[in-house]
Regions:
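Non-catalytic substrate-recognition and accessory regions of acyl/acetyltransferase enzymes
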Residues: 1-113, 120, 124-142, 146, ...
């Protein structure tokens, strides 16, 4: 199946249309993904905190969405020198800017959901980050996820490495070098 990606920024002057698109989205597996999309993505877009992209299938259904942002990271001493170097380029540099895939959500209300894999969605998001890297540089991509076995296995299968262990209710952090993706 073919997919087209569009920015919600292209529809900001028609919030009624966006609200109609939002109504077609359901992610029962993670209500936070659905909540961000429906309640925060427009505001984050307007404030330039992030960019949200819609993935539309050839039947003009919303297949999923992803949100990209930049994040300032402080790599504490618990992060290995190898991972610190992957993120910042230097094993002794504690601060770094990193690309963030802040949201990644499939639309389970789409009748063709089984034909659209999470791997396809993350690959589309990574393609956009690669374009940004060509323009402004950058070394790595960060994702954060809940401590759920399926999520952890998904990101590890995609080549991400766990950056730090979870403490309390904090999200798990995974990174991948952009060099590894080329």
């Amino acid at each position: 199946m073919r997919y087209m990606t569009v920015s919600i920024r292209d529809y900001l002057d028609d919030e009624n249309l966006l609200c109609g698109i939002f109504e077609t989205f359901s992610c029962s597996k993670n209500k936070d993904i659905e909540g961000f999309f429906k309640e925060k993505s427009i505001d984050f877009e307007k404030k330039h905190f992030s960019r949200t992209y819609l993935v539309i299938d050839e039947h003009r259904n919303l297949a999923g969405y992803f949100t990209l942002a930049l994040k300032a990271m402080n790599l504490d001493k618990s992060v290995s020198n190898r991972l610190r170097k992957l993120v910042s380029g230097y094993s002794n540099k504690p601060d770094s800017a990193i690309y963030l895939i802040g949201q990644l959500g499939k639309n389970y209300a789409n009748p063709y959901v089984k034909q659209f894999s999470g791997d396809s969605l993350i690959n589309i998001a990574v393609d956009y980050i690669n374009e940004a890297q060509d323009i402004v540089g950058g070394r790595a991509i960060l994702v954060e996820c809940e401590n759920r076995k399926l999520l952890m296995e998904f990101y590890e299968r995609c080549g991400f490495q766990q950056l730090s262990k979870q403490t309390g209710d904090a999200l798990l952090t995974y990174v991948i070098s952009l060099d590894k993706l080329h």
